[in-house]
Amino acid sequence: MKKLLLLLLGIASIPAAFSQGGSGIDWAADLDYLASELPAKHCNLFAKYDKAQFETAIGAIKASAGEAGDFATALKTQQLIARLGDSHTMLYFNQLMNRQQILPLGLLWVSDGLYVIQTAEENKELLGHRLTAVGKAPVETVIDSLSTLFTVDNEAMVKSMIPQLFPSLQLLEYFGFAHNGQAELTLDGDKTYTLKPSDPQRAGRAAFQPDSLPFAIAERNVLFTDRYFPEEKIYYILYNSCWGRESEAEFKSREKAASLPSFTEFGQKAFGILQGNPVGKIIFDMRNNGGGNSAQGTAFIERLARFLEQHPGIKTYVVIGRSTFSSATLNTMD
């Protein structure tokens, strides 16, 4: 059983298993397996990267695996896979990450940079400040380095992934931006701050608490929901995941499916609202949708298209964002 886990969506899967704790990995065997099976299973692995370069890189990673250690070897392998140019093909190195080496650093990327929006209570003075450097490296350099760990399809993907990777002290140490179990942060105004890992399960988090939240933000953690705004004659569909009870039952766990909302029932409700209320605009919001099963969305959209043909006065708007990915992108094109 292979210990190298590959997350391969949309192509035939490769047998794999997690390495618990990162010990006992036979990197030579796993990398040989990767080098032979990934090209065989992928529809066109070398569309953007030369096969000879790939094989040479595999050899170099094998040669350094013993000295580099499991985590660094996994990252080197993922950096190679990212260069292949397929964002649905990746090595899931998270299983080798130490959860006790996560910085309490929630970041939001806005137009002028990365801002701290969440941290531990003892670091709350960081809140609202823009991050400008880590150690001696400008934040742009840190972003460039972290971006080698995933395939960059577009700028939106970078803005989505970087805030997720940034809090990992292990990653910052791998790239040489942090040392001695802590990160030296520089904030706007040239303020410096030493940040150490914090227990992710511990209470006492500090975060911005706005007075009110827009509908799409307040409901961002549900699979899908809707709201009719009668004064504006707007029907708002918030589609956060291409998933639901039916998809779970078909592709994963029938037992878990019972606890999930039914997209079929949601669709019936949606068209009941459309047919029973004056609607001038439909907003179909997929800004938080990272994918799943595109088929359910396609069927809904096709039915919606037929409805709109009969009601040409209704304007439809589709909202996407940096987290829109995979099946959600397909549904956007639908």
Label for each model-derived stretch:
Residues 8-9, 36, 217, 291:
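A ubiquitous, low-specificity "background" feature that marks scattered single residues
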Residues 129, 281-283, 287-334:
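Conserved acidic, small-residue-rich alpha-beta core segments centered on
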Residues 14-15, 98, 297:
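Hydrophobic alpha-helical membrane context
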Residues 1-21, 34:
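Bacterial Sec-dependent N-terminal signal peptides
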